[in-house]
């Protein structure tokens, strides 16, 4: 494993690895220890007390963060008929039918999110092996398989983020950029944490929020005290 650079070591020395900080303190410290020479993303990782091998403990969904993520998301919509005009009016970057299936099969991936109307899923299903591993396959749970393409596109453009618990029960998500104010990041964090709290499976036993940490791109992780979490 490569040794971390001097800038990282200096930044990490400001973080007490034995301490669990309040949300406010952790976000402030994560911003202060950002070492990237660009407007880094602020990421959070929630380790949840769930068993993702059980169908009723798989957590997946999407939430619109009140202050967005600071990242412009490029959207591809699979639709036909009047839904094409609806998607265009909502501000989608690309919209169409089978022609985009062919483009993707040929290696085109100039988009971040895929939305599809239910009647297009037969075509989109052909791309399962390509879109699935990249986390781009439309899914009703995240609101990306819908007839309301206007709402779907507008929410994505407004800062909607998808979340999904990985095998170890960890949910990773971006809550903004280092250039955001502390208040904006705290509000985004609280919104995501509240959504995850409400998504707790009834069959999950013991401590739900096992550990939470916030970090910036290339920066050290800062542990958050979960004692006050519901």
Swiss-Prot record:
GO terms for cellular component: large ribosomal subunit. GO terms for biological process: regulation of translation; translation. PROSITE patterns: RIBOSOMAL_L1 (PS01199). Keywords: Repressor, Ribonucleoprotein, Ribosomal protein, RNA-binding, rRNA-binding, Translation regulation, tRNA-binding. The keyword Ribosomal protein applies. Signal peptide: none annotated. Disulfide bonds: none annotated. Pfam families: Ribosomal_L1 (PF00687). Gene3D superfamilies: 3.30.190.20, 3.40.50.790. GO terms for molecular function: rRNA binding; structural constituent of ribosome; tRNA binding. Belongs to the universal ribosomal protein uL1 family. This is Large ribosomal subunit protein uL1.
């Amino acid at each position: 494993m490569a040794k971390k650079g001097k800038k990282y070591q200096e930044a990490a020395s400001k973080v007490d690895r034995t301490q669990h900080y309040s949300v406010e303190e952790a976000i402030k410290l994560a911003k202060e220890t950002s070492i990237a020479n660009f407007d880094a993303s602020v990421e959070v990782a929630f380790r949840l007390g769930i068993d993702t091998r059980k169908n009723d403990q798989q957590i997946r969904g999407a939430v619109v963060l009140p202050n967005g993520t600071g990242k412009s998301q490029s959207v591809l919509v699979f639709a036909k008929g009047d839904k094409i005009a609806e998607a265009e009016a909502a501000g989608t970057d690309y919209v169409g039918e089978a022609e985009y299936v062919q483009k993707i099969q040929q290696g085109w991936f100039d988009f971040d999110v895929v939305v599809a109307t239910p009647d297009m899923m037969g075509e989109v299903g052909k791309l399962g092996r390509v879109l699935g591993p990249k986390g781009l396959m439309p899914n009703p749970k995240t609101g990306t398989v819908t007839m309301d393409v206007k709402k779907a596109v507008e929410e994505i453009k407004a800062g909607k983020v998808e979340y999904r618990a990985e095998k170890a029960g960890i949910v990773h998500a971006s809550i903004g950029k280092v250039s955001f104010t502390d208040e904006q990041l705290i509000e985004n964090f609280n919104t995501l944490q509240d959504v995850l709290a409400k998504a707790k499976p009834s069959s999950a036993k013991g401590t739900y929020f096992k550990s939470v940490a916030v970090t910036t791109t290339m920066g050290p992780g800062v542990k958050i005290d979960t004692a006050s979490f519901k």
